[in-house]
């Protein structure tokens, strides 16, 4: 098993390395395999117990690291495992096609839906191509175009949020980054079709919110949602980005804390070790949640749907 272990997972990594070394010896020397099998089994049990212990007590900074894990599933992974007949749609019909934000029509258990999400990319070449998952205004305008298309054809909208934030470059600002985000917030609040938003990695500031207004907001267990990154917060408050762990704890960016504050609707449990450990399992859990959400929302008429969404949005910040 090839895994990219994070710093806090190093004790697990050391055990897994020992297990792999013993397996190599066992494969090379069949006469020793019987003796080694028992030792390998004991180490595997120890590794499992250690993983459970570490992941039962994660801090906010460790969750933030998991949300950014280089092997974490991205929107295209979920599209492949949850939906069928995906047909990508491109361009904002005004300036360009932003590769950081993707979308298209697909089927969820046979039901046509519009799927929209951030795509960070894997490997240097694709990360640059996808702008590290940070959309420009044309990306958000593309998303809005697809949402309006979905509304016209009465298709539910499902979004996957995973971005460090909207791209802050000069060109993006010149083309109206803040206006594009604000327009999406307003438009999504009034869409006459069900909208289900899912934070599957990083939920970074306005870049996440621009496709994050909906009837349901779900978060994966080890995803984050915040107005700024922990490093950015630490740089502002303490003038020291090394204080990011303290900032993460103070920001309340984890799914558990946001559920307590009633800012999200549900937490989708991840496989032990994180979503990247078992794509099939997390996809099945996410699909079950989407199907349940959609069944409930489609039972409402348009007026009930809009009133429910309005009340949900108005409850934010209420004490």
From Swiss-Prot:
Name this polypeptide is given: Acetyl-coenzyme A carboxylase carboxyl transferase subunit alpha
Domain of life: Bacteria
InterPro entries registered for this protein in UniProt: Acetyl_CoA_COase_a_su, ClpP/crotonase-like_dom_sf, COA_CT_C
Enzyme class: transferase
Alphabetized GO MF terms: acetyl-CoA carboxylase activity; ATP binding; carboxyl- or carbamoyltransferase activity
Keywords annotated in UniProt: ATP-binding, Cytoplasm, Fatty acid biosynthesis, Fatty acid metabolism, Lipid biosynthesis, Lipid metabolism, Nucleotide-binding, Transferase
Biochemical pathway: Lipid metabolism; malonyl-CoA biosynthesis; malonyl-CoA from acetyl-CoA: step 1/1
Family: Belongs to the AccA family.
Annotated GO CC locations: acetyl-CoA carboxylase complex
Protein species of origin: Photobacterium profundum (strain SS9)
Domain CoA carboxyltransferase C-terminal, residue spans: 35-296
GO BP: fatty acid biosynthetic process; malonyl-CoA biosynthetic process
Reaction(s) the record says it catalyses: N(6)-carboxybiotinyl-L-lysyl-[protein] + acetyl-CoA = N(6)-biotinyl-L-lysyl-[protein] + malonyl-CoA
Protein's cellular compartments: Cytoplasm
EC id: 2.1.3.15
